[in-house]
């Protein structure tokens, strides 16, 4: 009898482990935290907007080559060419899916305190993407729920590096406000109404603007185009080629009322072709822009719609591991990045 005991025990143990493995995969909840984003999740995209799935590519290959085993010399796929420098630009990157051209201009802006014209440095980024999967919003928080009172701050640099970005700018300061719509990468994270005028990045890569007080978020997210991003800060600076602010317009919070400040502005030339400006301020050699000056400048670059993001000491432009501008916070001595709640990534 004893000689049958070991095989019996071993068989029961093996069977038990197999049952547990199935339960663990399908039923037993894990202890992992909820992750607020998935950079590889392209479920938002329809057949025409997103990158092709691997299965689709395989199916196409099988249709074109019904007898792959008969090919003695199959063609090798050419490696993607990536260009990382250009003589005409401060920074440059070009791949099949992303092109970023960065340069700096120095312009004259008005110092209304002293009634003189002063120099202001503006970093400009001309960005093209092949589809919206390369235009990402990313929170500083990794685990948990990204709402007011439960968030984590980090620098634009850290957020960009963690998101494997090539180019990034600071976001809309969602974490610093209790209300305001938040949609990132096709997912809704907050739908409480604020007084903000918002920017929506539609699923075809175009821009739209709307006021939260007049527009339920459900109306935006149910649009047939789909809402890929919704940023809540504002105001809109340019809409349909028209400047929407004047020299008296200013955000309701902030110290630079009607005067020069660091500005972060994102605009669109055409779907999937964007233009971004980050101006420096609070520096001896760079005074800053009013909202009207920021609108005039970016409109001169051919944008059709432009939107004001969180500026001031938060305004940061980052490229391939390097902060290009000199962020300056009035509450902190010296130059350095302010920790923020979110960033906009191109990858």
What residue spans do the PLM features occupy?
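Zymogen propeptides
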Residues: 2-193, 198
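Conserved hydrophobic/aromatic beta-strand scaffold that supports enzyme active sites
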Residues: 122-126, 236, 265, 343
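Short acidic-glycine loop/turn motifs at beta-strand connectors
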Residues: 128-131, 201-207, 211, 239-240, ...
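Short, glycine-/Ser/Thr-/acidic-enriched flexible segments
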Residues: 130-132, 174, 214, 244, ...
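Short, solvent-exposed aromatic-acidic interface loops
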Residues: 139-146, 214-217, 279-283
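Loop/turn elements at helix/coil->beta-strand transitions in domains of secreted/extracellular proteins
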Residues: 163-166, 206, 242, 271-274, ...
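Active-site-adjacent helix-turn-beta-strand microarchitecture at beta-sheet edges
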Residues: 170-256
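Conserved, well-ordered active-site substructure
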Residues: 178-201, 248-304, 309, 314-347
């Amino acid at each position: 009898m004893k000689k049958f005991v070991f095989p019996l025990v071993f068989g029961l143990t093996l069977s038990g482990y197999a049952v547990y493995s199935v339960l663990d995969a399908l039923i037993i909840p894990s202890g992992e935290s909820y992750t607020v984003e998935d950079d590889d999740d392209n479920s938002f995209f329809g057949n025409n907007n997103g990158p092709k799935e691997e299965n689709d590519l395989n199916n196409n290959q099988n249709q074109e080559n019904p007898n792959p085993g008969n090919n003695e010399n199959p063609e090798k796929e050419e490696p993607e060419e990536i260009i990382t420098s250009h003589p005409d630009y401060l920074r440059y990157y070009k791949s099949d899916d992303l092109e970023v051209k960065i340069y700096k201009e120095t312009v004259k802006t008005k110092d209304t305190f002293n009634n003189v014209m002063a120099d202001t440095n503006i970093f400009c980024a001309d960005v093209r993407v092949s589809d919206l999967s390369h235009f990402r919003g990313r929170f500083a928080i990794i685990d948990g729920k990204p709402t007011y009172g439960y968030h984590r701050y980090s620098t634009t640099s850290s957020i960009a590096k963690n998101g494997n970005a090539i180019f990034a700018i600071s976001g809309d300061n969602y974490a610093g406000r209790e209300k305001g719509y938040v949609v990132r990468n096709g997912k809704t994270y907050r739908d409480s109404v604020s007084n903000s005028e918002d920017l929506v990045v539609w699923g075809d890569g175009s821009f739209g603007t709307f006021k939260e007080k007049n527009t339920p978020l459900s109306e935006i997210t149910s649009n047939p185009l789909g809402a890929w991003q919704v940023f809540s800060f504002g105001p809109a600076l340019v809409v349909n080629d028209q400047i929407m602010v004047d020299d008296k317009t200013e955000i309701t919070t902030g110290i630079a009322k009607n005067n020069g400040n660091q500005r972060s502005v994102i605009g669109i030339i055409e779907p999937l072709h964007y233009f971004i400006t980050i101006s420096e301020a609070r520096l001896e050699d760079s005074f800053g822009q009013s909202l009207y000056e920021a609108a005039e400048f970016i409109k001169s670059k051919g944008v059709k719609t432009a939107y004001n993001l969180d500026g001031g000491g938060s305004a940061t432009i980052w490229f391939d591991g390097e902060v290009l501008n000199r962020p300056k916070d009035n509450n902190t001595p010296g130059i350095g990045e302010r920790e923020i709640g979110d960033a906009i990534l191109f990858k």
